[in-house]
């Protein structure tokens, strides 16, 4: 009797799932990015500008400081080049791409984060437009770029072509310590009326950066200012690019007046004994995703949420598995029943054929006996010697027919129940083995999802949020200030000092540098 065959349905290989999960985790590693930001106000890099429209060595010091900065150790290096006396800053080194124009332009193949006022170039006039004859006044255009750059493999070119009035250019790639506090004389009470620079800058900046935090620090005693001297001096440290025969120097200083700490709430330009002082608000932009420099703290995941998620997914998947198994079991049982019916029909047909064959053999034997008896009555020998041929006899093999009768039903020889991998079934009934199978599958799936599902969800969520934040927003903002226009404060809860900001015409007489 042949050995019975048993069909096995082994459990799903857990190792394959684990390898697939580890592959997904490896692909979902966060991309390492780094950003360097420019800021306005205190703690900023500056460049000096001389009468021949060339930069002093302070810009080289800025580039060298950036190349050696511990804050941006892996960022591309800066190089400096002069074309017809005008500086060109390339990042990384140039590869045949140069831009010219009357304004500062930014050409990039990678994506900038939070560019200043959402455009490639931006002019912010602190005063009304000056005529061609006002070479000695302080009518300058203030142009600043806030660039939060991440890793890229393209060419980033930052080019300035200075025509007419020289723009105020500030560079800052990392924070530097505050310069030593200068010894300022007592301030004069003759204030030069300022215009709407603070409110203008705050309002336009707030509307341009929906995904960036605006850092505003107006609290005393510290206030940044730019001192205007009426003579040209060379500087080995950082400076600013300003018109001919003028050098602006930026410091964070304190003002000790009789009214307490000086707070530039309504005046932008005021007189001191050595010249005029230009006050700038300490505004900087911070990307919300990298606002905190402290290492991120690890927050313990709620065990209730993790267990609930894992068990819910496990129960759902196990229910699907049991349902599929039940359907497969039902289909296999129906197939076995049909095969048993066909088997019985075939066995019946074979037995009937065997019976008919036995009857034919009996008829043949009877005919042989009759012929032999007839030949002997006539005086001859039997049939075979008379015709001189060997005698043939019909022999029927009944072994296969006997085996057909010993066959068991197909349902007893093929098991439709799940078998253990080691070919033993613990001697349990079918429904008990199916229950153990379901419970074991539920436990394995719950354990698997409890450890790996939160990691996958967190990885996919972070990747989705990163893709959503990578879309650059460049809102076009044009704000030619009207003489009689009003400007809103940045926030409704801003200090009371900002509610008095109103546009006023500058006093052209007091705008000239003091001797």
From Swiss-Prot:
- Feature type site, description Cleavage: 301-302
Region (Fusion peptide) residue spans: 304-324
Question: Where do transmembrane segments lie in this chain?
Answer: 436-456
Record: glycosylation sites: 129, 203, 230, 251, 256, 271, 287, 351, 398
Entry comment on modification after translation: Specific enzymatic cleavages in vivo yield mature proteins. Envelope glycoproteins are synthesized as an inactive precursor that is N-glycosylated and processed likely by host cell furin or by a furin-like protease in the Golgi to yield the mature SU and TM proteins. The cleavage site between SU and TM requires the minimal sequence [KR]-X-[KR]-R.
Q: Where is the signal peptide?
A: 1-33
What keyword terms does UniProt attach to this protein? Answer: Cleavage on pair of basic residues, Coiled coil, Disulfide bond, Fusion of virus membrane with host cell membrane, Fusion of virus membrane with host membrane, Glycoprotein, Host cell membrane, Host membrane, Host-virus interaction, Lipoprotein, Membrane, Palmitate, Signal, Transmembrane, Transmembrane helix, Viral attachment to host cell, Viral envelope protein, Viral penetration into host cytoplasm, Virion, Virus entry into host cell
Q: Where is this motif: CX6CC?
A: 384-392
Location of region: Immunosuppression? 365-381
List the residue ranges forming a coiled coil, or say none.
Answer: 330-376, 388-420
- Gene Ontology BP terms: fusion of virus membrane with host plasma membrane; symbiont entry into host cell; virion attachment to host cell
Disulphides:
212-215, 212-392, 384-391
Kindly give the PANTHER family that the UniProt entry links to this protein: ENDOGENOUS RETROVIRUS GROUP FC1 ENV POLYPROTEIN-RELATED, VIRAL ENVELOPE PROTEIN
Name of the featured protein: Envelope glycoprotein
- The source organism is Bovine leukemia virus (isolate Belgium LB59) (BLV)
């Amino acid at each position: 009797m042949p050995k019975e065959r048993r069909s096995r349905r082994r459990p799903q290989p857990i190792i394959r799932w684990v390898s697939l999960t580890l592959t997904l985790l490896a692909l979902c590693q966060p991309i390492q990015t780094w950003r360097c930001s420019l800021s306005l106000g205190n703690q900023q890099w500056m460049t000096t500008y001389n009468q021949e429209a060339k930069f002093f060595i302070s810009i080289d010091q800025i580039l060298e400081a950036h190349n050696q900065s511990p804050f941006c150790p892996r960022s591309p290096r800066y190089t400096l080049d002069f074309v017809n006396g005008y500086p060109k800053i390339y990042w990384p080194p140039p590869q045949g791409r140069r831009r010219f124009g009357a304004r500062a332009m930014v050409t990039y193949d990678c994506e900038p984060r939070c560019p200043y006022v959402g455009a490639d170039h931006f002019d912010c006039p602190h005063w009304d437009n000056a005529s061609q004859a006002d070479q000695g006044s302080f009518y300058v255009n203030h142009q600043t770029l806030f660039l939060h750059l991440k890793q890229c493999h393209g060419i980033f070119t930052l080019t300035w072509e200075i025509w007419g009035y020289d723009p105020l250019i500030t560079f800052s790639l990392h924070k530097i310590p505050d310069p030593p506090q200068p010894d300022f004389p007592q301030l004069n009470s003759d204030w030069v009326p300022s215009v709407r620079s603070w409110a203008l800058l705050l309002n336009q900046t707030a509307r341009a950066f929906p995904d960036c935090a605006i850092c505003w620090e107006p609290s005393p005693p510290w206030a940044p200012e730019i001192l205007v001297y009426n003579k040209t001096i060379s500087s080995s440290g950082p400076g600013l690019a300003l018109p001919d025969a003028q050098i602006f120097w930026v410091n964070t200083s304190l003002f000790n007046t009789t009214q307490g700490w000086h707070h530039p709430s309504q005046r932008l330009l005021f007189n001191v004994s050595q010249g005029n002082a230009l006050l700038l608000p300490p505004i900087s932009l911070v990307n919300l995703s990298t606002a905190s420099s402290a290492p991120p703290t690890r927050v313990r995941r709620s065990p209730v949420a993790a267990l609930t998620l894992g068990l819910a997914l496990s129960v759902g998947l196990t229910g699907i598995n049991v349902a599929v198994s039940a359907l497969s079991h039902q289909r296999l049982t129906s197939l076995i029943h049909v095969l048993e019916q066909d088997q019985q029909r075939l066995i019946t047909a074979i037995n009937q054929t065997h019976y008919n064959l036995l009857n034919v053999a009996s008829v043949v034997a009877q005919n042989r006996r009759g012929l032999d008896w007839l030949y002997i009555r006539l005086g001859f020998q039997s049939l075979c010697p008379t015709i001189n041929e060997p005698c043939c006899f019909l022999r029927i093999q009944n072994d296969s027919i006997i085996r057909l009768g010993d066959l068991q039903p197909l349902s007893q020889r093929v098991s439709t129940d799940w078998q253990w991998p080691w070919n033993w079934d613990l001697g349990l009934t079918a429904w008990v083995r199916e229950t153990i199978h379901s419970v074991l599958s539920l436990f394995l799936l719950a354990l698997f999802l409890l450890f790996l599902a939160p990691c996958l969800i967190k990885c996919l969520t972070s990747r989705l949020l990163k893709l959503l934040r990578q879309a650059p927003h460049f809102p076009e903002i044009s704000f030619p200030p009207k003489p009689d226009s009003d400007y809103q404060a940045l926030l409704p809860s801003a200090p009371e000092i900002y509610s008095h900001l109103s546009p006023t015409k500058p006093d052209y007489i007091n705008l000239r540098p003091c001797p």
